[in-house]
Amino acid sequence: MNSSCKSRVFNIISIIMVSMLILSLGAFANNNKAKADSHSKQLEINVKSDKVPQKVKDLAQQQFAGYAKALDKQSNAKTGKYELGEAFKIYKFNGEEDNSYYYPVIKDGKIVYTLTLSPKNKDDLNKSKEDMNYSVKISNFIAKDLDQIKDKNSNITVLTDEKGFYFEEDGKVRLVKATPLPGNVKEKESAKTVSAKLKQELKNTVTPTKVEENEAIQEDQVQYENTLKNFKIREQQFDNSWCAGFSMAALLNATKNTDTYNAHDIMRTLYPEVSEQDLPNCATFPNQMIEYGKSQGRDIHYQEGVPSYEQVDQLTKDNVGIMILAQSVSQNPNDPHLGHALAVVGNAKINDQEKLIYWNPWDTELSIQDADSSLLHLSFNRDYNWYGSMIGY
């Protein structure tokens, strides 16, 4: 090939390479712009401080994907690629904050769960945030509400009082989750306002950072799951005191593989003389729980404390239902939910750590938390101590 041909070929190759470089730079710029636009529209949640104890960060990043995958499996949802948003806090209207950290769990671009890190046992309630032992829990708590405004460039504060949970945005307060109380008002708009002190203390979080998990690691995180084969959520507690009725109905439906039990019918059986108007205020006592179970052909017995992981595993394999009995840590005598009952659905091993799966009648989905934690941080910002169990449903 003569020198003029070589020069012509070299020039053509150079032009092609420069063109490809320009195109790739353009694509990179467009991609970055798209990412920037996406981030600019993301939800921001106000917090007093974005400082989070390192042990909380580590636990959240280590555990969230396995927890999400395990909960997806329970609802027969397709697993996906899980990401973790930034931690946020929940405040009372006077500015007090609770003792937990909350993370949005994102799957395929949607907020699907909330990961909660809260004190592990009663003794931890008196420790500093840095010295506290934390329990990890996952549920759908306010996840759908957050997802609805995730891409609307919203800036909110998450608030709570005895009536439920609220989002405050641009001075307007909106109720998103109402506490299950008899006669509770369910209006979505609220005249409440954030205290001046809290407004002064709040600052905006940075754009939520998504921590991407390696796909191979996600596959290995859930080593084992064991649940009551026929457990289904058919109803939800709201404006009544029937937590034990809901729990017994769900467990008996599961272990008998039927759909004939419901909370209202159980409470009506226990209180045949009470009017329909007064029935929502009726609670259930341990002797009633035992007697009702026996009337349905079940040998129910009370066991103090939290059952061991091995016991839950075996009882679940044997198709035997366990009802959690819990007491509010606050011990407020005016609290209509001073005591609470929940249903154990099964157990799991995630990241080689033992977990329990349970249903809180206040919720529409299951929750998963550490098997060695006796403290239950439930949907309405309440800490309950798991003091005993009714076994045999």
UniProtKB/Swiss-Prot annotation:
Q: What does this protein do?
A: Cysteine protease that plays an important role in the inhibition of host innate immune response. Degrades host elastin, fibrogen, fibronectin and kininogen. Blocks phagocytosis of opsonised S.aureus by neutrophils and monocytes by inducing their death in a proteolytic activity-dependent manner. Decreases surface expression of the 'don't eat me' signal CD31 on neutrophils. Cleaves host galectin-3/LGALS3, thereby inhibiting the neutrophil-activating ability of the lectin.
Cellular component GO terms held in the UniProt record:
extracellular region
Top EC class per UniProt?
Answer: hydrolase
Tell me more from the record.
The cascade of activation of extracellular proteases proceeds from the metalloprotease aureolysin (aur), through SspA to SspB.
Subcellular compartments: Secreted
Is-annotated flag, keyword Glycosyltransferase?
no
Keywords for this protein: Hydrolase, Protease, Secreted, Signal, Thiol protease, Virulence, Zymogen
Induction summary: Expression occurs in a growth phase-dependent manner with optimal expression at post-exponential phase. Environmental conditions such as degree of aeration and salt concentration are also important in control of transcription and processing of SspB. Up-regulated by agr (accessory gene regulator) and repressed by SarA (staphylococcal accessory regulator) and sigmaB factor.
Q: Which InterPro entries match?
A: Cystatin_sf, Papain-like_cys_pep_sf, Pept_his_AS, Peptidase_C47, Staphopain_pro, Staphopain_pro_sf
Could you describe the subunit structure of this protein? In the cytoplasm, prematurely activated/folded SspB forms a stable non-covalent complex with SspC.
How might one describe the regulation of this protein's activity?
Prematurely activated/folded staphopain B is inhibited by staphostatin B (SspC), which is probably required to protect staphylococcal cytoplasmic proteins from degradation by SspB.
Task: Please give a single GO biological process term from the UniProt record.
Answer: proteolysis
PTM per Swiss-Prot/TrEMBL: Proteolytically cleaved by staphylococcal serine protease (SspA).
Gene that codes for this?
sspB
Where are the bilayer-spanning segments? Answer: none
Report the PROSITE patterns cross-referenced here.
THIOL_PROTEASE_HIS
- The active site annotation covers 243, 340, 360
Give the pro-peptide residues: 37-219
**What EC number(s) does its UniProt record assign?**
3.4.22.-
Similarity comment: family membership: Belongs to the peptidase C47 family.
Marked site, Cleavage, at 219-220
Question: What name is this protein filed under?
Answer: Staphopain B
Q: Indicate the secretion signal residues.
A: 1-36
Report the GO molecular function annotations: cysteine-type peptidase activity
